[in-house]
């Protein structure tokens, strides 16, 4: 099974890495329901869904292990396996032959082996966190043909350099000398001496940033493409030419063509044949007229010898004899200024034949002619060059003027475009305003129609006003249409006039540019003659351009003023119309609002009446509830008064009974202890010996009838916050008491019993002494008790009475009194308040002090 994708970063032989060299000693394996091998650890382990769980690659010496991504994570030792398949979980157990004492780190990577006897000593291999080999300790040779203990890798798994090594490899170059950049491309090599089988030396190769070879520097080596070491490349890495070292010297070809500077000189002399060059020596021989032919011959000779003037300054120039032996070249279109050409030169034989032998012929040496002609020729050439430069400068200045004019025209065009755009925007705004006016008019017409439909009998004034409004609105619409047409006509006329002026200017510029080009293309003579005329024309042209610019500026200003005036007129007209229209709208809306206000006031009056009636009902219900509550509280107070009077009568009866018992003891000379017993037990719960036994649950006789006193009812205060058929809570009572500082139901006067005559001492029945033990508590003021400190858990009666007094005195004052009674202050040092006032908050509860007692 080939697994090249597991270690794609590791170079090796034929696409295999060092963990993929399998042996033939494979064990048996099975398949699951999906056809995946499940029991052979040398292949892979899959789950029920076909996903790879674990993969162990089998090699000669040790068993490789892989993680879930296929990277090597560790190696087991041994090569003998005994498989035990689990039918449920497809797990297997391995029994390894512990041939080596392998050591692993926490990630399962081998970190060292004790000395072994195998060929490939993997006990020296080291791996990084990605499973790539990063170095090896000194070990033996391996079957990879290079020494991995010298390889170094970067964080991406690419080789970045190697230490010095001596092992040769089968790839044709030495890894020890290779250098790589950050992307893993080779960028250079150090000097090396290993020969390779690829036909060129990698040690001399250099690469650019894209990994391509830009040049080769070894002149004695050739690469495998066949071109030499002088190959050159351009910026785009394309081959320019194949150039050898001796190529330029061997491949030089002698050209018979005339040099370019000589051709230029020949053309210049041919064009200037009638100028001062030919008549240079006429100053000395003006008196001798028969020598015209000789002068013509001399000019012809000079003209034939002028191509040699370019070689005067050359050191290898051979002297030329007076007899003309050099080849004479003439242009086909050349026209000689002499009349006797046949007598002067025979061009077919390339020799100068002199027919007038009888005449005195003066043969001037060529060197003298050249020395005489050269300074004049140079002066003329300089003068012509200066004139040409002047012409070029003037043409450049004229071109700059044209460019400025074009720029001004462009700016004027842009300004006109902006004005046109502004006109367009103003037209669009006018159209939008017209649409809005139409929509508002339509809404007005709809409202008018609605008002007409509602008011079946409108008055004549309303009809007249509506008709006037309609007429005015129609007039407004008509005027708006007219303004639209006027604006469109003005914009079209301005566009047409601007386009015409623009076309005229462009035509004038084109004509003038053509004239300039024609004049610049003229010859030297015509240019010299027409130079003054050109200057005048240029001045006139500049004046015309200035006039055109001024005219364009004036036209633009006038157009802008017209547009501004038209826009201001339109705005003023529209503002006046809109103001009148707004006044009318405000009148109509004010009328509608007044009508709606009258309707709303009528509806509000009805609502206010209904609310007043409901409020009066609620007040009557509240008053009735308060009265019911007052009556109930009066009944409750009457019941409490009756119970208290009953208990008071019982206490008085017990006191009388105790007094009678004391009198009887004095009469019968009783012991002091029995007297104390009678005094300490006035109710008679402990049975005395002199009294007969009485059952403790014997019923008491009914109390005597009491006449109902005449009740004097005080005026009650109604509670306006109480709802009907609802009992007030304690919180409501306390709040009302605190607000009004008095009870809603004031205490009624208790009825006073009529004075009864003192009864005669007589023998009372024993049933009076038989009271239940839980009816009335024993009062403190009847039994002598030792004095004691006020305690929180005692005197509950006083606390309850103080809470009941909150109805009269207010809840906050009652709570303040309770806190001052039962909660002593947290400290007794008043100087702490000045030093650290936070002690007050730390001790006890917050104090309510309305009287500033502290």
From Swiss-Prot:
It is found in: Cell membrane. Residues 258-267 have a biased composition (Basic and acidic residues). Residues 1-24 have a biased composition (Low complexity). Residues 91-109 are annotated as: Fibronectin-binding. GO terms for cellular component: plasma membrane. Residues 1-33, 247-327, 411-434, 743-766, 835-854 are annotated as: Disordered. It is a peripheral membrane protein. Residues 311-320, 411-428 have a biased composition (Polar residues). Residues 384-622 form a coiled coil. Keywords: Cell membrane, Coiled coil, Membrane, Repeat, Virulence. Residues 746-764 have a biased composition (Pro residues). Binds immobilized fibronectin, specifically the gelatin/heparin-binding domain. Absent in high passage extracts (passage 164) versus low passage (passage 14) due to a 17 bp duplication that adds a premature codon. This is Fibronectin-binding protein PlpA.
């Amino acid at each position: 099974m080939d697994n090249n994708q597991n270690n794609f970063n590791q170079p090796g032989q034929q696409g295999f890495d060092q963990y993929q060299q399998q042996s033939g000693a494979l064990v048996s394996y099975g398949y699951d329901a999906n056809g995946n091998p499940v029991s052979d650890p040398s292949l892979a382990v899959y789950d029920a869904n076909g996903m790879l769980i674990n993969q162990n690659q089998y090699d000669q010496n040790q068993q490789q292990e892989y993680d879930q991504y296929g990277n090597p994570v560790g190696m087991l030792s041994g090569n003998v396996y005994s498989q035990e398949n689990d039918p449920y979980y497809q797990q297997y157990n391995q029994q390894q032959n512990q041939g080596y004492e392998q050591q692993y780190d926490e990630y399962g990577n081998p970190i060292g082996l004790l000395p072994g006897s195998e060929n490939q000593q993997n006990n020296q291999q080291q791996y990084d966190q990605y499973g790539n080999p990063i170095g090896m300790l000194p070990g033996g040779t391996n079957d990879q043909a290079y020494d991995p203990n010298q390889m170094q890798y970067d964080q991406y798994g690419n080789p970045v350099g190697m230490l010095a090594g001596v092992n040769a490899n089968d790839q044709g170059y030495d890894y020890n000398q290779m250098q790589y950049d950050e992307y893993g491309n080779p960028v250079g090599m150090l000097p090396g001496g290993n020969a390779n089988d690829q036909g060129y030396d990698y040690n001399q190769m250099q690469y650019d940033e894209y990994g391509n070879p830009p040049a080769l520097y070894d002149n004695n080596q050739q690469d495998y493409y066949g071109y030499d070491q002088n190959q050159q490349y351009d910026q785009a890495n394309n081959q320019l030419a194949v150039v050898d070292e001796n190529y330029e010297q061997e491949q030089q070809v002698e050209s018979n063509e005339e040099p370019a500077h000589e051709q230029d000189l020949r053309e210049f002399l041919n064009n200037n044949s009638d100028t001062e060059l030919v008549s240079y020596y006429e100053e000395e021989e003006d008196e001798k007229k028969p020598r015209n032919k000789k002068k013509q011959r001399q000019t012809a000779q000079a003209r034939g010898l002028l191509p040699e003037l370019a070689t005067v300054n050359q050191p290898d120039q051979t002297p030329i004899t007076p007899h003309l032996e050099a080849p004479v070249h003439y242009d086909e279109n050349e026209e000689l200024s002499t009349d006797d050409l046949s007598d002067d030169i025979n061009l077919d034989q390339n020799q100068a034949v002199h027919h007038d032998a009888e005449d005195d012929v003066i043969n001037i040496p060529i060197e003298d002619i050249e020395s005489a002609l050269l300074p004049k020729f140079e002066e003329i050439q300089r003068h012509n060059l200066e004139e040409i430069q002047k012409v070029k400068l003037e043409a450049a200045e004229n071109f700059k003027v044209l460019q400025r004019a074009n720029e001004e025209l462009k700016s004027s065009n842009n300004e006109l475009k902006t004005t046109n755009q502004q006109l367009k925007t103003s037209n669009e705004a006018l159209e939008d305003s017209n649409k809005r006016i139409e929509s508002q008019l339509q809404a007005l017409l709809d409202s008018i129609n609605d008002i007409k439909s509602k008011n079946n009998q409108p008055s004549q004034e309303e009809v007249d006003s509506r008709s006037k409004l309609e007429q005015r609105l129609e007039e407004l619409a008509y005027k708006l249409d007219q303004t639209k047409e006027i604006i469109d006509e003005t914009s079209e006329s301005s566009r047409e006039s601007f386009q015409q002026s623009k076309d005229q200017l462009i035509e004038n510029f084109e004509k003038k540019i053509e004239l300039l080009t024609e004049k610049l293309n003229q010859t030297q003579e015509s240019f010299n003659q027409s130079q003054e005329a050109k200057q005048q024309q240029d001045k006139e042209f500049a004046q015309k351009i200035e006039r055109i610019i001024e005219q364009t500026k004036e036209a633009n200003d006038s157009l802008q003023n017209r547009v501004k005036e038209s826009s201001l007129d339109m705005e003023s007209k529209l503002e006046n119309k809109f103001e009148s229209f707004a006044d009318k709208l405000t009148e109509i809306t004010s009328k509608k609002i007044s009508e709606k206000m009258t309707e709303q006031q009528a509806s509000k009056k009805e609502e206010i009446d209904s609310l007043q009636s409901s409020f009066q009902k609620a007040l009557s219900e509240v008053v009735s509830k308060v009265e019911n509550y007052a009556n109930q509280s009066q009944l409750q107070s009457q019941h409490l008064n009756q119970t208290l009077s009953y208990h008071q009568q019982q206490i008085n009866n017990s006191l009388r009974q105790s007094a009678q018992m004391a009198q009887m003891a004095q009469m019968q000379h009783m012991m002091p202890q029995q007297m104390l017993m009678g005094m300490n037990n006035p109710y008679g719960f402990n049975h005395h010996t002199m009294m007969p036994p009485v059952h403790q649950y014997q019923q008491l006789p009914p109390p005597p009838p009491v006449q109902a006193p005449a009740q004097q009812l005080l005026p009650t205060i109604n509670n306006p916050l109480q709802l009907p058929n609802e009992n007030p809570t304690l919180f409501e009572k306390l709040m009302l008491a605190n607000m009004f500082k008095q009870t809603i139901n004031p205490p009624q006067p208790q009825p006073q019993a009529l004075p009864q005559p003192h009864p005669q001492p007589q023998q009372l029945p024993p049933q009076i002494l038989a009271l239940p033990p839980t009816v009335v508590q024993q009062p403190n003021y009847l039994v002598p008790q030792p004095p004691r400190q006020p305690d929180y858990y005692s005197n509950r009666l006083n606390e309850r009475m103080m809470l009941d007094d909150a109805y009269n005195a207010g809840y906050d004052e009652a709570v303040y009194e309770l806190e001052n009674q039962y909660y002593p202050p947290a400290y007794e040092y008043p100087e702490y308040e000045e030093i650290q006032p936070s002690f007050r908050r730390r001790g006890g509860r917050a104090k309510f002090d309305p009287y500033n007692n502290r």
